[in-house]
Structures are given as C-alpha cells and as structure tokens.
C-alpha cells in the first residue's frame, strides 16, 4: 500500500524523502486563485520519477454553480490544471464537488457536473472528493453523492475519500468504504485525516492522526479496506509520524 502526504510544491521529491512518503500530492498553483498553473521547471524530473504525484485542483472550482461567473472559470481552470498535471505525469487530479444555491437546484447541478466532464479534454484521471460542509453541496452527504454519481459515474470519473470530510459531514466512518463503494463502485485515493471537530460539525479542520476527534482505529480500518493509495493532508509537524503510524498498522 502506498502511503504519503500532501507536500509543498517547491520540491515534492525532497519532501517525500524527508517524510518517508511513497506518494505525494501537490498544488500546481495558488489553491485560492483563478490564475492558471505555471509550467514547472522540474516537469521532466517529476514525469520520470517512479513516485506517484497527485495534483489537488484549486478550492475555488465549482462546476455545479448556476452562476456563469463561477462555473465558466471553474471549467477553464480545471482544464488548465489537468493540462499542467499531464505535463508532470501526474497520477490524477483531485477536485472538490462544489455546491448549488439551494436544494431545488441540485438536479441542475448534477447536469452541470456532467457537462463539465463531457467537455474536459484530458488523459489524466480526475477524482471527485467528498467535502465536509455546505447545505447544498454536491459531495457532502452520501445520498447526494449517489444522485450525482447516477449522472456522472459513466464518464469514468474516480473517487477520493476524505476521512475528515466524511466525519464532518456527519456520515461517520463505520463501514464508510463499503458505503461509498456501494455508490461509486470504486475508491481511487484516500485522504486520511483526523478531525479537530466533532462528528457532523461541517468544519473542515484536519488534525494529525490520533490527535483529533476520530478513533485512530477507524482511520486504519478505512485505509485497509479501501486498498487505495493514501495521502495524509495533516500538519507538517507530525506528518512523518502519521505516515509511519499508518504503515505500521497496515503492514502484514
């Protein structure tokens, strides 16, 4: 099982070595900006490495939005991110589900997601990530994810399970992998994060493993059953220990 972390984009391979990571995730630009990613000077090095590199798309992306001033730039930067990810030989691009203005717009939001994927031109796999909060989110509640997947599942989109987000969404982590796989048929990547807040809080505040509100054994169980590469999106101080903890608990 590949276990690693989200690291600084400055020198991801060096960071992986320091943290003992088998796999890394990076941003290719400012995650809070609409500015397109710039080409990396180390693109050839990253493309040649045996270490899988995942890319997290900007947080601003919301292809489900009815607001064209949000939706159209979202589609554009998703395409630009996928293009930049291809340039470094990325394993996949991870993107949040986004949201709509109210529950009456959910079905249209699902269709906007489908249109965005149909228009996307890339050979890099794209993974939808479940999110922590939002009353009208596309990927917070599992029942809503199921409705979205009915519309987009056949496009070949993958799924990234974030443990903190599932906890914050109020979904809990008992049998979480089985429940998601019953919807999507797949889990391609796990973001293994503890949570600083109580279950159902709707707050996306990650904690190092064992230092938050989630029973560490539930995190280990989810990682084991998922059988997918794992990324710890936790604080740099303690992240090396998070990787070592998961590696010890999942070995053998």
Swiss-Prot record:
It comes from the Bacteria. Its EC number is 3.1.21.2. Binds 3 Zn(2+) ions. Zn(2+) 3 binds at residues 165, 204, 206. Pfam families: AP_endonuc_2. It catalyses: Endonucleolytic cleavage to 5'-phosphooligonucleotide end-products. GO terms for biological process: base-excision repair. Zn(2+) 2 binds at residues 129, 162, 191, 233. Its cofactor is Zn(2+). InterPro entries: AP_endonuc_2 (IPR001719), AP_endonuc_F2_Zn_BS (IPR018246), Xyl_isomerase-like_sf (IPR036237), Xyl_isomerase-like_TIM-brl (IPR013022). PROSITE patterns: AP_NUCLEASE_F2_1, AP_NUCLEASE_F2_2, AP_NUCLEASE_F2_3, AP_NUCLEASE_F2_4. Keywords: DNA damage, DNA repair, Endonuclease, Hydrolase, Metal-binding, Nuclease, Zinc. CDD domains: AP2Ec. Gene3D superfamilies: Divalent-metal-dependent TIM barrel enzymes. GO terms for molecular function: deoxyribonuclease IV (phage-T4-induced) activity; DNA binding; DNA-(apurinic or apyrimidinic site) endonuclease activity; phosphoric diester hydrolase activity; zinc ion binding. Belongs to the AP endonuclease 2 family. Endonuclease IV plays a role in DNA repair. It cleaves phosphodiester bonds at apurinic or apyrimidinic (AP) sites, generating a 3'-hydroxyl group and a 5'-terminal sugar phosphate. This is Probable endonuclease 4. It comes from Mycobacterium leprae (strain TN).
């Amino acid at each position: 099982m590949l276990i690693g972390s989200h690291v600084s984009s400055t020198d991801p391979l060096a960071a992986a070595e320091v943290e003992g990571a088998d796999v890394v995730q990076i941003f290719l630009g400012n995650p809070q900006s609409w500015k397109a990613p710039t080409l990396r000077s180390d693109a050839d090095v990253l493309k040649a490495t045996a270490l899988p590199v995942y890319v997290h798309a900007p947080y601003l992306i919301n292809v489900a939005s009815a607001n064209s001033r949000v939706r159209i730039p979202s589609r554009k930067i998703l395409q630009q991110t996928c293009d930049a990810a291809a340039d470094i030989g990325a394993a996949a691009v991870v993107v949040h589900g986004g949201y709509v203005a109210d529950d009456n717009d959910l079905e249209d939001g699902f269709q906007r997601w489908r249109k965005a994927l149909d228009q996307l031109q890339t050979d890099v796999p794209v993974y939808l990530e479940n999110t922590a909060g939002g009353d009208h989110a596309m990927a917070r509640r599992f029942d809503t994810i199921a409705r979205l997947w009915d519309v987009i599942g056949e496009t070949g989109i993958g799924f990234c399970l974030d443990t903190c987000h599932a906890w914050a969404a109020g979904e809990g982590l008992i049998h979480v992998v089985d429940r998601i796989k019953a919807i999507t048929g797949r889990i391609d990547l796990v973001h293994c994060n503890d949570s600083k807040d109580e279950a159902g809080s709707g707050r996306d505040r990650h904690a190092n493993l064992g230092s938050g509100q989630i029973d560490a054994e539930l995190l280990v169980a989810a990682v084991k059953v998922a059988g997918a590469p794992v990324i710890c999106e936790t604080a740099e101080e303690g992240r090396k220990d998070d990787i070592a903890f998961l590696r010890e608990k999942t070995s053998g």
